């Protein structure tokens, strides 16, 4: 399955697609988005 993800950031809204076997953070990084995280 593929999901449409809407990310609301201080810079604006971004939309990405993500498969059910992929982490949202990884999908965002592939699209060039720099999301804050501390879980890796």
Curated annotation (Swiss-Prot):
Binds 1 [2Fe-2S] cluster. Pfam families: Fer2 (PF00111). InterPro entries: 2Fe-2S_ferredoxin-like_sf, 2Fe-2S_ferredoxin-type, Beta-grasp_dom_sf. Its main location: plastid. It comes from Pisum sativum (Garden pea). Residues 3-40 form the 2Fe-2S ferredoxin-type domain. [2Fe-2S] cluster binds at residue 39. Belongs to the 2Fe2S plant-type ferredoxin family. Keywords: 2Fe-2S, Chloroplast, Electron transport, Iron, Iron-sulfur, Metal-binding, Plastid, Transport. Transmembrane segments: none annotated. One of its GO terms (molecular function) is 2 iron, 2 sulfur cluster binding. It is found in: Plastid, Chloroplast. Ferredoxins are iron-sulfur proteins that transfer electrons in a wide variety of metabolic reactions. One of its GO terms (cellular component) is chloroplast stroma. This is Ferredoxin-2. Its cofactor is [2Fe-2S] cluster.
